[in-house]
């Protein structure tokens, strides 16, 4: 069962928490749709900013707080915070959201321990026609050297321009998908190549959440 569903949702409230933190009895569908649109917009327009995670919180007065975790905060903040103000204006105008929005930037330091950053980097290199096997090998080495206890990378599509699509995967260390206390960071990304799209999945095992108590 553990290897058939998202490792993140499988361990919610154990090793991770929800990316959207709010509650609504009446306008749940509309708010959820707004969250999806905000995330899609930010992921599309901040590709080079090293995005790791986007959390969205809402207050009772309707204020939306967007927390962006990134390895390159300077690219988003801009000079004197001008980048954040411009980003807020674009979200309000392009998505048609008529609510107050606050944007908070949090820096991610150890980029090789964040699955989303790694997945995005792989997708970017695939779009530049880098050999997928070389990418896999480099990724395993980088993540394991950063202190991970295990890493797995899977790619699916017309790899290296092959006529028939296939899925390739490789791993190092261990990935205990059935252990609920295992802190596993999971992420997906899509590479848009001249041969079609290539799906990328990354699992990073950081250890058990109870290890410090043993």
Locations of regions flagged by a protein language model:
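RNA-contacting regions in translation and RNA-metabolism proteins
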Residues: 1-214
């Amino acid at each position: 069962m553990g290897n058939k569903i998202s490792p993140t949702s499988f361990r919610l409230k154990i090793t991770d928490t929800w990316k959207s933190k709010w509650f609504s009895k009446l306008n749940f569908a509309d708010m959820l749709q707004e969250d999806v649109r905000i995330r899609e917009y930010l992921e599309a327009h901040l590709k080079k900013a090293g995005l790791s995670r986007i959390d969205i919180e809402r207050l009772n007065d309707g204020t939306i707080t967007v927390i962006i975790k990134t390895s390159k905060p300077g690219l988003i903040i801009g000079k004197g915070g001008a980048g954040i103000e411009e980003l807020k204006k674009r979200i309000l105008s392009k998505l048609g959201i008529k609510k107050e929005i606050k944007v908070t930037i949090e820096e991610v330091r150890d980029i090789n321990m964040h699955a989303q950053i790694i997945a995005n980097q792989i997708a970017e290199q695939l779009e530049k026609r880098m050999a997928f096997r070389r990418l896999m090998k480099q990724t395993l080495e980088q993540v394991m050297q950063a202190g991970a206890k295990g890493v797995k990378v899977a790619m699916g599509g017309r790899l290296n321009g092959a006529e028939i699509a296939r899925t390739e995967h490789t791993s190092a260390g261990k990935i205990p998908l059935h252990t609920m206390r295992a802190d596993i960071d999971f992420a997906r990304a899509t590479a848009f190549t001249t041969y079609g799209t290539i799906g990328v999945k990354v699992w990073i095992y950081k250890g058990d959440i109870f290890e410090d108590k043993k």
